[in-house]
């Protein structure tokens, strides 16, 4: 399941006040004028959220995620591309068309390089 179920610890880091703006319809995330392809899904919750950098022991998340929402269904986060099901070819899809990038159960998947950029940001606006 793509929605995270276990978050272990929050991490305190230097923060960047500029929000990440995610457009679900175009499957992109932008910081000011710099935009990046993302994997999203029809269940990606829209709204404005604070981001909390958290460590996780869940497999396939590479140790940390940026949590933006938690509810009874689980935890929604921005994280590196989840490769728990290799048949989904998520790394390839990240480079594909918008329709290729609509695959997640609500989380926002990004490349390793994009995650490194996003990691210091503490606000996301999802449209």
Model-flagged regions — what are they?
Residues 55-127:
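Exported/periplasmic cell-wall-interacting domains
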Residues 1-6:
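Classical Sec-dependent N-terminal signal peptides that target proteins to the secretory pathway
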Residues 15-88:
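Gly/Pro-biased beta-strand-loop elements
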Residues 8-9, 13:
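Hydrophobic helical h-region of N-terminal Sec-dependent signal peptides
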């Amino acid at each position: 399941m793509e929605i995270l179920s276990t978050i272990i610890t929050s991490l305190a880091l230097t923060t960047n006040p500029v929000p990440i703006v995610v457009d679900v319809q175009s499957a992109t995330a932008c910081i000011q004028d710099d935009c990046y392809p993302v994997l999203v899904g029809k269940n990606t919750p829209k709204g404005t959220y604070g981001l909390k950098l958290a460590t996780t022991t869940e497999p396939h998340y590479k140790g940390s995620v940026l949590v933006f929402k938690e509810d009874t269904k689980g935890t929604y986060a921005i994280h590196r591309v989840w490769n728990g099901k290799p048949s989904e070819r998520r790394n390839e899809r990240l480079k594909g068309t918008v329709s290729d990038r609509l695959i997640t159960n609500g989380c926002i998947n990004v490349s390793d390089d994009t995650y490194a950029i996003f990691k210091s940001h503490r606000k996301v606006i999802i449209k």
